[in-house]
Amino acid sequence: MHIESKNRQIKKDIVVEITKKINDSQSLFLAEYRGLTVAKLLNLRKEAKKHNVEIKVYKNRLVKLATQKLGHSDLDKFLVGPNLFVFSNELGMDGAKVLAEFAKKNKKLVLKAGIFDGKVVDAAGVKAVAELPTYEEALTILASSLLGPLRQISLSFKLLVDENKLSN
């Protein structure tokens, strides 16, 4: 009886930990890792660490308790099978990017779902998040889209000046 209550307390502590991780992270993504070797999982963890992304394995039932407590019960239907949980600590899309990139090379890793921007997303949503540009990439895109028209205007002025020189 004493052991049972101790196990129950351990599980409650894990639910509190999961709840805190979800609250403290920018996003949460999950993927099924059935069939992946330990070596490949270690490679995934190393890659995740480079991007300040944390990978954990929890019992689905404990994650379900935490997500229900946080109002994300839509995630429940994805919590079947052996899942790993990816918490993005800095940029919300980093976890999805790490998982999607790894899944391209390792077909046994199956993207399932996640919580991004406070909403539950399915596998297609995880892939869409993975394709979002980083802040730096977005700035580059913005800068190049602004510079294009400016180049055209300056070229037009140059042509006008050259045309005026020729006519004089």
Curated annotation (Swiss-Prot):
Which intervals of the chain form a coiled coil?
A: none
* GO biological process terms on file: translation
The record's annotation in InterPro entries points to:
Ribosomal_uL10 (IPR001790), Ribosomal_uL10-like_sf (IPR043141), Ribosomal_uL10_bac (IPR022973), Ribosomal_uL10_bac_type (IPR047865), Ribosomal_uL10_CS_bac (IPR002363)
User: What's in the GO CC field?
Assistant: large ribosomal subunit
Q: Which GO terms describe its molecular function?
A: large ribosomal subunit rRNA binding; structural constituent of ribosome
Q: Which domain of life is it from?
A: Bacteria
Q: Which UniProt keywords apply?
A: Ribonucleoprotein, Ribosomal protein, RNA-binding, rRNA-binding
Q: Which family does it belong to?
A: Belongs to the universal ribosomal protein uL10 family.
Task of the protein: Forms part of the ribosomal stalk, playing a central role in the interaction of the ribosome with GTP-bound translation factors.
Annotated PANTHER family: 39S RIBOSOMAL PROTEIN L10, MITOCHONDRIAL
How the protein assembles, per its UniProt entry? Part of the ribosomal stalk of the 50S ribosomal subunit. The N-terminus interacts with L11 and the large rRNA to form the base of the stalk. The C-terminus forms an elongated spine to which L12 dimers bind in a sequential fashion forming a multimeric L10(L12)X complex.
What name appears for this protein in its UniProt entry?
Large ribosomal subunit protein uL10
Its source organism is Mycoplasmopsis pulmonis (strain UAB CTIP) (Mycoplasma pulmonis)
